[in-house]
């Protein structure tokens, strides 16, 4: 708290939770932070999420629209209940969305929901359950080694981000995360000036796997050409 890295971290987590209403493969599901930051982080992140205007995306004042369908909203609510086996909700009411515009009864609106798990080393749901929506769980660590261990319990992901201005800490954590994540981003006061953020695809790198958009190479610059070529 009180550092540029802390502010960048809070802003990036809130953005990655709410862009596309959290319905994207690189959305932040687990927030691993120093235990001494618990109170300040939950307060700052909860306040930022609470200011998110929800409603009809055609409304210029709205910053987050609905989920893909009413069924998807019920699925996310069910996953929140699963997560609640290990964690408690500290911000956001999943059952009573606060919307700026649109029809609350017909639209699949959902408030951003932040949970807190005090003992993530002994928990399973917070590492195994993915709520494909604006939902994330804060979990504390006491050492860099513990932070890496908690990250690894997610069994791999497309991207992990480390926010720190300490080169030694960054080196230790990045080396521990690299085998389990497709990309590792380092965020600090210097890189923030040019960083495209946690979830942005980068030129020359594949982004994602085989899906409706392609094989992950369509955003890879010149590598994208190979997507349309026969190769043996």
Task: Please provide the spans of the model-predicted regions.
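Conserved C-terminal structural/oligomerization subdomain of aldehyde/semialdehyde dehydrogenase
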Residues: 4, 15, 47-48, 53, ...
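ALDH superfamily catalytic-core signature
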Residues: 1-121, 149, 177, 222, ...
